[in-house]
Amino acid sequence: MSRVMIEPASYDNIRKSVDRAFELFPADLSGKKVLIKPNVLRTAKPEEGITTHPALLEAVVEKVDSLGAGEIVVGDNPGMIDYGDNEKSFEKSGLMKAAKSCYRNMGTSSRKVGFNPDYMPTVSVSEDVLDADFFISLPKFKTHGLTVITGAIKNSYGILPGAIKAHLHKAAGSPQRFHELLVDVFRLRIPDLIIMDAVVGMEGNGPASTELRDIGQVLASDNAVAMDSVVSSMMGLDPGKLRFLQKAKQEGLGDYDPQSIKCIGEIKTFTDYHIPPLGGEANINNSAIQELIGNKTLLVPKVDADLCTSCENCIEHCPVGALDMGEDDIPVADSELCITCFCCQELCPEKAITLQ
């Protein structure tokens, strides 16, 4: 039976929760190379709730160091791929300072490994991920327009450097296939320990929504499927309705059935948690809608002219070239080309894009 720790926490006393996580999931880290991967979607301030909070990263780095790790590497591959974006993302989020000189740009060195040929025969994975003796994942408690939630499994998408993430979005072609692809990426290097920042969560059109909610908890587990099941339940969702959890169970990576999970601590269940449009219970249960989603997008990006600064970031990062500059220098999406990958929404620095 998988276990998930649910511990009350604030950013001021988060070290206590980290210590508790290592008590429940002990690890011999003496002399080992330890990779710590926060969720760094893009450049964002800590108070925006988009990235893993620096207080959690700092506490984990200090704990791992106290356990005698031989080498500590802190890194991620954010969605933005321009030169210097990795460093900028860590600096602005406060994670560079929290990493305590352990930061490394993981995107500069990678190796090709075999992958699911239905998408691509090989993919590049950051060498620091493949070479780590122990892999700690630090996801954020958030919703996601494409995958409904972004938790333990989705955080592993960041082991892929550069534009490979965008290429896989294009190769998937539909939300349902992307759910399945996520599990294939996750299997390339399964985290040994997951500690989730659920002190402040995100709802609505995540993973870069303006809607934040106080959760006041830190979650931990050595099984990502179990953790994402608990996160789904906390958001008021049936975890068995999420395709990526279904596939993960089929692949023997864990069980999302709440009866197979031992929760150490009290689960907070929110009956009014704001779920993205594609993630609503009505859509999940509606086979006709799901069939349409599998073949053609129901939602396309809409840009708020009052918020947009015409930076063209969304246009540059669209993997299928579905966005172009329209009238009044406001980007417009071609619904025939759009594959609903949500990259534009994720990477918009002004949060000016919604899927409608």
Where are these regions (language model features)?
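Short, contiguous acidic/charged loop-to-helix segments that flank catalytic cores in large enzymes
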Residues: D306, E336-L337
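Short Fe-S-cluster ligation motifs
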Residues: C338-L355
